[in-house]
Amino acid sequence: MAESRDAHELLLIEEADAWFEYLEATRGQGEVRYGEVEPWAWSRLRQRLRALKARRARLERQAA
């Protein structure tokens, strides 16, 4: 049970890291540069969140 809780906490930390990566990439960019960087940053964020969702689902199946 404790292992499951630790794994869940690690997934939450990874999710927060994904959001911080997005913010770091887009924050403080000029309008033109933001337009270039934001689609990449959003795509990267969505990719990381999808992977985390899949890992979370696997973790929940194992716990059941």
PLM regions and their residue ranges:
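Short, charge-rich amphipathic interface segments used for partner binding and complex assembly
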Residues: 24-62
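Short, charge/polar-rich alpha-helical segments
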Residues: 1-16
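Face-specific signal for non-transmembrane alpha helices
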Residues: 16, 21-23
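Short intrinsically disordered terminal tails
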Residues: 1-3, 60-64
